[in-house]
Amino acid sequence: MKRLPLLLLLLAAAAAFANPPFAPNVRVSDDAGGQVINQGESDFAVWRGQYIYSCCNLAERSTVAMIPYAWSTNGGTSFAPNIPFNDPTPGNPWHTDPAIGVDDSGYVHMIVQYSTASLYHYFSRNGGQTWHDTTFVTGSGVDKPWMVVYRNEIYITWQQTSGSLGIWQAKSTNYGRTFTTGRIWTRTGVNALGMDENQNLHLGLVDNWPSGNVYYRKSTDRGVTWSTEILLSNSSYSTGYGDRAPINSITARGQNVFLTWVDSRTGTWDVVACRSTNGGATWSSRFTVNDDTAGGQCKGWAEFDPYGGLHVMWYHTPNWPTNSSSRWSIRYRYSPNGGASFNPSLRISDTTFASPVDFIGEYHVLRSDSQYIYAQWTDGRAVTNNDLYFSKALLSSVGVAQGNDRVPNPVVPKGLLAPTVWAGPVVLKLSPREQPVSLALYDVAGRKVRGLYEGKVVVETEVRLRSSEFHNGLYFLLWRSGQEQEVKKIINFPR
């Protein structure tokens, strides 16, 4: 019976980590400039799986003139000390709404909005440590810009709030040295911009909240012309602590197009979506993505991976209405069929958290490549302020086959079978793999406790241990083979 309180304690500790297959969270921000600041809405880009470039704005952006910029050269295992990016040229200290991308040479492109007075494009050849070229994109009235970088081409869309109102587009075909701009839509609202693998541009719009509509348009000639708008749904949205806009996202792969936004018609926030299976020609009815409708769900973001798997993340809190004591977490769902159905949601954030400020950013994003799904967000686990955090998961571990043909998960045995509670004799089973296998045990601080296996596994192999070989507590088993990876949480009772 004495073990029961300890077991409950350890189970509670185990709950304070991201659900596998997502890796333990890595802090991205470090209060650039030496100030205690609250990181807000963020964007990031991934280059060749190794280089990650991140930017965000601040809750204090009206008084602290900078965009915290961070980068990783090891796939997000760690991030270098942040650079407090600041440009006095626009003459406006309000640095906000940044977006970032990487071109075909690995050079970094970033756009920054200065209040609503102007928008500038920045170009770096050394991963953002210095910025070599600055280009004025547009002037007064700019709000909520989004950017797509493809090879030497850059596409930017934003809401124009003064002058010729509407959704505007800027396009560059020379790496951002010059831009052509023009109005492409007379409607206003929050827009979402995406590009599929065939270089079709997809544009979503939520207008006139608290009560408005959701629209879609498409360009098949790289922004020269745009299709007639399609009305997808009406919308309903009310602001609250932690969220203040029905931010939408759009992603496309093959003939599948998926658009999300935040809706509060049920009395609380939900992440809702419409989907198309014919390239945006026709659309489904609106449906709810989150599988827990209690409390509030907001800041949804969707991303198709290169194999057509669909990934969606959002902020979740069980509390309603939201306030400074609300406990938030980052949730995630995977769909193998373009959003027709979803697996149960997982938690990406290691812990729940409250936000010390109302502004948690209006958007945070997912990115993917041929191996991983990547996530970045801001949270208040530090208690005094909000910081950016990062996590990733192997596509093969969230139900994605490494190729164009889908393979249901049960066909390929898991590489590691292991009990999650160790008390006495322990048997770990390793399944055969073509690539060498490594298995190691780590403590909660990420320190390697012991290597348990290293080498080829031709037939099912057992690794036998006793729980008495290790101290009481929480551990992680890390199994790797080639590009595959599995992480399991272990609670150990020495016997």
Report residues per predicted region:
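A periodicity- and composition-biased signal for non-globular, repetitive helical segments
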Residues: 8-9, 223-224, 494
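Extracellular, repeat-based ectodomains that mediate carbohydrate processing or recognition
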Residues: 18-398
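C-terminal outer-membrane/trafficking sorting elements
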Residues: 406-495
